[in-house]
Amino acid sequence: MLGASKIEVALVLVMGVFSAPSFLLMAASGGNADAAQKSAQQATLRPASASSPDIPFSDYDSGAEQLLLELANQSRAQAGAPRLTLDAGMSRAARAHAEQMFAERQLSHQFDGEPSLPQRLAAATSIQLDQEGENVALDFDAEKGHQHLMLSPPHRANLLNPAYNVVGLGVVRSGDRLYIVQDFGHALPNYSPAEVKDKIAAAVLQVRHDTKQPELARRDLSAADAAACSMAQADKLGTSPVHQLAQRYTVLTYTSLHPEALPENASHLLSSLNLHSFSVGTCYSRTETYPTGVYWVVLSLD
């Protein structure tokens, strides 16, 4: 199982003291909150065919890939899980990994010098994923491969995971053997920058409504966007532009995959009687810490 990208949250307070378990109080220096891990489920299956003699590489087997997709969706329908949509980029990543397994003559989720699964998928597709998983196998044909995968609990769990909605399939044929890679993911909606800001703003106003506080005025602040993009560029919270912004406002910074959801315990800060207005600054970016992308968010409050 691969460790997943962490989601960070930090709070810069100009005046007063605020304490909550899921936030980090910052003054002159930045820092990271505890990682909130998402999982990338991985499993490996090596049937008896793995011991047969090596046979030269033939080609990708698109027919086997299509059959594996159909069989997976049939099994998912029986289990009440949504259908998987084939993603061309994820399939390129799966094929490349299947060819690497053939070249190494072994099954693995990551060979020496090879990028991690999230990094491979990020390099191959433009869709934003918040979950990834992978099955690899070696078998004689696609139908038997699917049957064997379904008999293995961790592989079956990946195939039937209701959270997954996209898949990439790669099958390399080598004589009578198939090197099989199934890369699963949960693709998030593709929001415009304005939509992201609107969703965050709606969440802020909902907190005010739920806590029976007066509605905050929303204002545009270009410095908040600049601060958010500075965090994305630095791949960390608490950059110099954030601290400069914090000289004038109370600033909450965090990373998120879901703009409609505020950080845990943010309502404690947002329900303050002393607040009158807010602005939202965002920047979407793929970084080393977040290879499949994340929203960097700056909320300024006064």
Which ranges hold each PLM region?
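N-terminal Sec-pathway targeting helices
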Residues: 1-12
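A well-ordered secondary-structure block
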Residues: 2-3, 31-34, 116-183, 239-302
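Intrinsic disorder/low-complexity segments in short proteins, especially the signal peptide
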Residues: 6, 16-18, 28-30
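Bacterial N-terminal signal peptides
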Residues: 11-22
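Signal peptide processing junction and immediate N-terminal pro/mature segment
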Residues: 22-39
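A broad detector of the eukaryotic-type serine/threonine protein kinase catalytic domain
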Residues: 80-81, 141, 188-189
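Extracytoplasmic and endomembrane cell-envelope/extracellular-matrix remodeling and assembly machinery
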Residues: 174-198, 202
